[in-house]
Amino acid sequence: MRQLNRLNQFQRLWQQSQGGPQQTCVAEMARHCICSERHLRTLLSQWQHAGWLSWRGEPGRGKQGQIVFLRSPEQLRQQLLQQQLDAGDAAEALQLLDLPPERLINMLRPLMGGQWQNDTPVLRIPYYRPMESTEPRQITGRAEQHLARQIYSGLTRFEQDEPVGDLAHHWQHDEASYGWLFWLRPQLMWHNDEPLQAAQLVAQFRQLLRDTRVSMLLADVLSVDAPHPLAVRFVLRRPDFWLPHRLAHLLCLLPHPIDPATGSGPWKLRHFSAELVRIESHARWHLQRPLLQAVEYWITPQLFDPALGSSCRHPVQIAIGDAAELRTLQPVSSSISLGFCYLVCRPRAGFTPDQTRTLFQLIQQSGIVSRLPLDEGLITPSKELLPGWSVPLIDAVTVPLPATLTLHYQLPVELHQMSQALVALLKQHGCTLKVVFHPVKNWHGIDPLDEADIVMGDRLIGDAPVFTLASWLQTDPLWRPLWPTLQGEEIQAQLLSIQQIADDETRARSLHQLYHQLMTGGILLPLFNYRYQIYAPPGVEGIELNTLGWFDFSRAWISPPIDPPCSCSAAD
C-alpha cells in the first residue's frame, strides 16, 4: 500500500522533532526515512503538494533548510482511513491501525457503530477475537453460529422458537409420517447469482449425512431425493416430528456445493480474515431484504481487557470506548441466556447414583456458585433449565463420597473458578478432586473424556430450546459413555419415543420429564446462566437481543443523516 508507506516515512521524519520546525538537510532526512536522497526529494515535492509540510531548502549538496509540518501523522492517518472506508475498502483501511491502544481508540471511535458511506448504511462492530470460521460444521462460538445463520439458509429456519419456511415455503408428511415433502420457493438464488436447484440440495444432504454429527442428528433419514425441481423428499425409518426442527439446525445449513463460502442467506460473505469480516446484503434473498448494506466486524483485541480471555464477559458492543464511556451509552437490550454451564456426573462402579446425588446436594446447599469470584452481574445461578422447567433441589440421604474423583472441564474461563471451588468443597468432605482442563468449546474429538467421573462445560442454547435439549442428548459426545449402560439405553428409548409424538406440547412435556429424571437422578446439574447485553450509540435502531446474545442484522437500521432530525415511527 503505497500511501501507507509514504505516511510511515512522513511519520519517521515528523518524530524527529515531534512536529516542530526542523533545520536539516536532504541527506539527514533520507537517513530517517530509509530511502535514497533522490527519492526523498520526490517525497518532499509530493508532501508539499499535498499540504503536509513546507520545505525551504538552500541550493547545493548538503545545504541545510527548514521544514515546517502542516499536518500531524495522526490527522493524515485518520484522513487516509476515512478515504479507504469511503471507497469500501475496509481491508486496506485496517492496515492503518497498527497503533497503541490509546491512540487506536481515538481513531476508531468516530468510525464505529452506524455510518453512512456514499449514501449506503454500514454497521461496524469492534470484536475482541478473530472469527474461527463460517463453515457451519466447523464452528463452536456463539458469534460464529450467529454469523453462519446470516450467510447460509436451510430448508427451514427458526422464528420465535418454531420452525418456519426458509428455502422451503411449506412441508407435509404422509399419513404414516415416514415420507416428508418440502416445497421449495421458486427463483431461489445463491450469493453468486446462480439459480439454486433442488438437485444441489439433495447432493448436499447426501454429503452431510456422511458427517458423524449430522448422521446422529438425522439418524432416521433413509434417503433424500428431488421428485420435482421445486421439492425435496425425505424418507424415514421411523416417524420423527422433530424433522423440521432438525433441518433448521446449524449442522443442516446449506453452503453452495462447489464454493463452501457461498450461501443463500440474507448476507453474503465479502471478506474474511483475522482482522476483518465483512458481509453485504444479498439483493436477491427470498425473504425480506436487510435494511443495512453491510456489516463489518473489526477484530481489535487491543481495545478489550486481555484479562477477560474467552470470557462471556465481553459484551456485544456496537459502540467503542473505554469502560467509563460505555456506561454513558444506553443498553438497548438485555436478557438471561437460555444456555447454561453444567455439571454432569457419570455413575459407575465406585461412583454410585447416591454419591452423585450427594454431590449435587452439597453444591446446592453450599451456595458456591453464587460466591464465585466473578464480576457482579456476569452470571446468575441456574434456577430453571428452561422457563418453567425448574431445577429440583436434591434432598438425598447423604453418603460418603469416593476418596478421589476426576473432573474434566472446558471453556469458558468462568469454569476455572468453578473447578477451584469444587476442589475446596470436596476436600472438606474427604474427597480429592483431580482436575483436567481442555481449552476447547465442545467435546468433539476429546477421547480422554471417557475417563471422567465429572464433566463441566457450556451448553449454548439458541433458537427452539426444547428441540436443542433433545438434540444435545443425541449428538453431543459428552453423553456417549452413558449409552452402553442400562440407564443410557432407557434414555435413548425415551428419546425415540418422544420424537414420534406429533403434538408439540405433549412432546415438550415428555422431554421435560426426561430431563427432570436426569437432574433428580444425579446426572445433570445446571450451574449458572449468563447475562447478555448490547450497548448501542444513537442512530442505530432495530436492535433486539436474540438467544445467542446477538441481534438480527436484517432488522437493524441506521437513521439517515437528515438535518434537522425528525421523529419517525414504524409503518402500519
Regions found by a protein language model. Give the residues of each.
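A structural "hinge/loop" feature
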Residues: 130-144, 194, 243-249, 535-552
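A bilobed periplasmic-binding-protein/Venus flytrap-type ligand-binding module shared by bacterial periplasmic
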Residues: 280-283, 335-358
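Ligand/substrate-recognition segments at binding pockets and active sites
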Residues: 19-28, 33-42, 51, 55-57, ...
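Aromatic- and charge-enriched surface segment that lines or borders ligand/interaction sites
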Residues: 18-21, 41-43, 140-142, 147, ...
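Detector for C-terminal structural segments
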Residues: 48, 58, 358-392, 417-421, ...
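Ligand-site clamp/hinge motif
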Residues: 284-326
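Surface-exposed binding/hinge segments that line
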Residues: 214-276
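N-terminal lobe/hinge region of extracytoplasmic solute-binding protein
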Residues: 126-173, 570
